[in-house]
């Protein structure tokens, strides 16, 4: 219970923990889903668009929590259409186009003069 309350405090929803989930906004449900996944202490998290519906403060909190999780030796796979976030958080990326992986590599090995967005546009023929 303490861990749930700790994460809920970090996400700013501690006062809502006794409310019905059906009354939660999309962002609050997203926060609750993250909390629910973390309290089991997994070594691997798979997240689909985890920043969708989050306000800037909650997004920052989630980024911090993700960085803490990885620094403890854990792994996160997540999908995102916000390439700037991917560039800031990830060491390794895969770009998928029409269901096929068209790039799979370490961000450090990318051309330093090219952003992830530029690489994405090139590989998906949207340049």
Show which residues each predicted segment covers.
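Conserved ABC ATPase "signature" region
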Residues: 1-16
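Conserved catalytic motifs of ABC-family nucleotide-binding domains
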Residues: 41
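Catalytic Walker B motif of ABC-type/P-loop ATPase nucleotide-binding domains
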Residues: 45-48
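Helical segment within the ABC ATPase nucleotide-binding domain
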Residues: 60-72
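A short, surface-exposed alpha-helical micro-motif characterized by mixed small hydrophobic
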Residues: 86-88
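ABC ATPase "signature
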Residues: 104-105
């Amino acid at each position: 219970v303490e861990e749930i309350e700790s994460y809920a405090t970090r996400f700013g929803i501690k006062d809502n923990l006794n409310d019905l989930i059906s009354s939660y906004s999309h962002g609050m449900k997203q926060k609750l889903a993250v909390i629910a996944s973390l309290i089991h202490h997994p070594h691997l998290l798979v997240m689909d668009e985890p920043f969708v519906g989050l306000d800037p403060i909650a997004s920052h909190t989630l980024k911090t929590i993700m960085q803490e999780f990885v620094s403890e030796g854990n792994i996160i796979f997540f999908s995102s259409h916000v390439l700037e976030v991917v560039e800031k958080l990830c060491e390794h990326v895969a770009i998928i186009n029409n269901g096929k992986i068209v790039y799979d590599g370490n961000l450090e090995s990318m051309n330093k003069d090219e952003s992830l967005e530029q690489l994405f546009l090139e590989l998906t023929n949207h340049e």
